[in-house]
């Protein structure tokens, strides 16, 4: 380990997405995050979109990477989850389910 980590902070986690519009809808309209920035990279044929609850200078954010074309991604076994703190998990799950979001393992139920 580096001897001085007091200035370290988590910047972002990156997820590859097939449908950027659907992913942005989920993170912004369902989870209430803000689209912080979005950039196309034509020479690399990909788009990066960053979403989060605060600015990137002080908060960790989610980077959504959309590779152009018909890329299929396998569900990896190493990725576990994103943890988001909410005031009432049961109410939040109910609200998300009412919006058509599939809750694979409802909290405490």
Give residue spans per PLM region:
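Basic/polar N-terminal segments that are highly enriched at the extreme N-terminus
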Residues: 1-6
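Core segments of cupin and vicinal oxygen chelate
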Residues: 7, 14-59, 91, 98
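Core-facing hydrophobic residues within beta-strands of well-ordered domains
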Residues: 8-10, 79
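Vicinal oxygen chelate
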Residues: 18-21, 59, 67-109
